[in-house]
UniProtKB/Swiss-Prot annotation:
Its EC number is 2.7.14.1. It catalyses: L-arginyl-[protein] + ATP = N(omega)-phospho-L-arginyl-[protein] + ADP + H(+). GO terms for cellular component: extracellular space. One of its GO terms (biological process) is phosphocreatine biosynthetic process. CDD domains: bacterial_phosphagen_kinase. Disulfide bonds: none annotated. GO terms for molecular function: ATP binding; creatine kinase activity; protein kinase activity. Catalyzes the specific phosphorylation of arginine residues in a large number of proteins. Is part of the bacterial stress response system. Protein arginine phosphorylation has a physiologically important role and is involved in the regulation of many critical cellular processes, such as protein homeostasis, motility, competence, and stringent and stress responses, by regulating gene expression and protein activity. This is Protein-arginine kinase. Keywords: Allosteric enzyme, ATP-binding, Kinase, Nucleotide-binding, Transferase. It comes from Geobacillus kaustophilus (strain HTA426). The lineage of its organism: Bacteria, Bacillati, Bacillota, Bacilli, Bacillales. PANTHER family: ARGININE KINASE 1-RELATED, ARGININE OR CREATINE KINASE. Appears to be allosterically activated by the binding of pArg-containing polypeptides to the pArg-binding pocket localized in the C-terminal domain of McsB.
Amino acid sequence: MSFEKFFNTAVSAWMSQEGPDSDIVLSSRIRLARNIVDFRFPTLFSSEEAMQIVALFERTFAHRSYGGAGRFELLKMSELQPIEKRVLVEKHLISPHLAEDSPFGACLLSENEEISIMINEEDHIRIQCLFPGLQLAEALEAASELDDWIEGYVNYAFDERLGYLTSCPTNVGTGLRASVMMHLPALVLTQQINRIIPAINQLGLVVRGTYGEGSEALGNIFQISNQITLGKSEEDIVADLHTIVQQLIAQERAARQALVKTLGIQLEDKVFRSYGILANCRVIESKEAAQCLSDVRLGIDLGYIKNISRNILNELMILTQPGFLQQYAGGALRPEERDVRRAALIRERLKMEERRKMEGDER
């Protein structure tokens, strides 16, 4: 398998599938933080220890197949170009921290990109499983099975009283971070999100932007995750998050219907204006593109737009990010060059989708 696939394909195989409640929940993710005995944690380890850990995982897991996920490939951060690392961040396959601050970092990626094992990030390894739509329980089951498989080859740092030991005290215990990516345009438009976020925080959950801590909720996409990892089982943590997410889904759907009733043609106009911008613009910044894609996605969900699939918007959401644009261009681009390239790419992709739809109708 060539590494090029990871950098040149915007939509991972798992993301092209429709999951439950995928009109609102883009993806579910389970991440497990683990450390290996006999090695100091990444906050204290030497460069020699870091390289030994990478060598251990390369020797043990690289090029091995795992179930339906396919074969693992090891990517070392030191061997990747800055644009390539940015692409992996934009696809949510690695964290910004691994890309930018881990000189001895690496990542094991499965062929279908459903599984990512980050090495030498904040912990020795961070196991990540991604599923489309609202599938937290399924993602947890997959991550737990993978965790057991890995533990058959390495010894984890574990304390009978505390649980799994991690670099950051907030991860001690289960080492589990469960999260969902949600598209919540109606809650933003009605400003209900301003009331909902503090309420969610009080329940021990965290609301972040598209790329996690410190990032902005571009295109009305929010990441909701647990904060507590100690004193609860993995199943309870996931069940609690699932309950809150279901409530958010119900609130978003109710807000959408309220907007249809109160705004009517104005909401439809907003959707088609955004579609018009995307289909005809010659220059567009990433923030405006994300907002227009959000409006069009809402229009598809409400039945206003019928000739575009939601999958195309998932693709454009990633294709229009700075890293991917530069990967497509074959090198670094100035911001103004990226804006021109982004506009051209969106126009071209929407025209292709319209042609595909017309050909399908003719048949």
